[in-house]
């Protein structure tokens, strides 16, 4: 691999193997991350699970249908501004606003992810690319302490690979991103279980009394910036895989993970 590509992969490894959203939230709120969950009611988990699935469905139906496929630089600042605005509203109303605010934020984020994918040479007309964009939402955090072995980038890709392939075939056969197909429902459920962890962290931070509308905007800005970084890293890996082959990139990725101290058990 050329040196510039090795450096790009090194940056991607750091982003994908050491997501920093929780730490960023703690900095915004000025409180330890461990205190966040105390700000949420016990009933929040069901509401968050329902909202994340709804948001991913909405994003899959809407966001990439309006994206152009001509390669150009990703316009991340516009999407951040839009997400921050929706977060200001959500920060004022908390959990009650989640069913409205989260789908809006997720659609904005998926459009931004598609923008990044296109800039890295992906074809947004390809259903597999659409689903690879959606897959980014599963790459942003752990499901729990017991999930460490399954949280590495390639581990998550491997866990989702069958569902992504089946969903891509479903979309090709139907000609549209149809709602309600069993394979799509299964894939969205898998992604939502991981996306929901980050959503919970976001909502818990917004529920801290000192946050308010301004803090809600800051949290949503960090939220979309987090997934933009994940997307940039994810599609950097995919670009390098197209150039050098998957095996070469995987070997280089694992070597860098070891050197940087991020190595996990290989699944």
Describe these PLM feature segments:
Residues 82, 86-100, 107, 111:
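Glycine-rich active-site/cofactor-binding loop and its immediate structural neighborhood
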Residues 101-105, 216-219:
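Short hydrophobic alpha-helical segments that form membrane-spanning helices or hydrophobic packing faces
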Residues 1-86, 111-267:
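Terminal, membrane-proximal amphipathic helices
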């Amino acid at each position: 691999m050329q040196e510039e590509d090795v450096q790009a992969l090194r940056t991607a490894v750091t982003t994908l193997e050491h997501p920093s959203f929780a730490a960023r939230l703690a900095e915004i709120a000025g409180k330890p991350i461990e205190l966040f969950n105390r700000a949420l009611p016990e009933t929040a988990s069901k509401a968050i699970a329902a909202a994340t699935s709804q948001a991913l469905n909405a994003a899959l139906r809407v966001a990439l249908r309006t994206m152009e496929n001509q390669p150009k630089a990703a316009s991340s600042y516009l999407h951040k501004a839009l997400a921050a605005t929706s977060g200001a509203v959500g920060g004022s109303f908390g959990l009650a606003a989640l069913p409205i605010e989260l789908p809006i934020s997720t659609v904005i984020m998926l459009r931004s992810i598609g923008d990044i994918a296109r800039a890295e040479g992906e074809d947004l007309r390809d259903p597999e690319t659409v689903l690879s964009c959606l897959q980014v939402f599963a790459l942003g955090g752990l499901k729990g302490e017991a999930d460490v072995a399954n949280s590495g980038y390639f581990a998550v890709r491997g866990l989702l690979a069958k569902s992504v392939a089946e969903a891509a075939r479903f979309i090709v056969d139907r000609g549209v991103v149809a709602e309600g197909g069993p394979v799509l429902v299964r894939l969205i459920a898998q992604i939502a279980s991981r996306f929901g962890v980050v959503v919970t962290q976001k909502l818990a931070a917004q529920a801290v009394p000192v946050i308010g509308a301004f803090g809600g905007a800051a949290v949503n800005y960090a939220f979309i910036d987090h997934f933009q970084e994940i997307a940039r890293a994810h599609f950097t890996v995919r670009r390098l895989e197209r150039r050098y082959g998957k095996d070469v990139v995987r070997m280089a990725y694992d070597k860098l993970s070891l050197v940087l101290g991020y190595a996990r058990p290989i699944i």
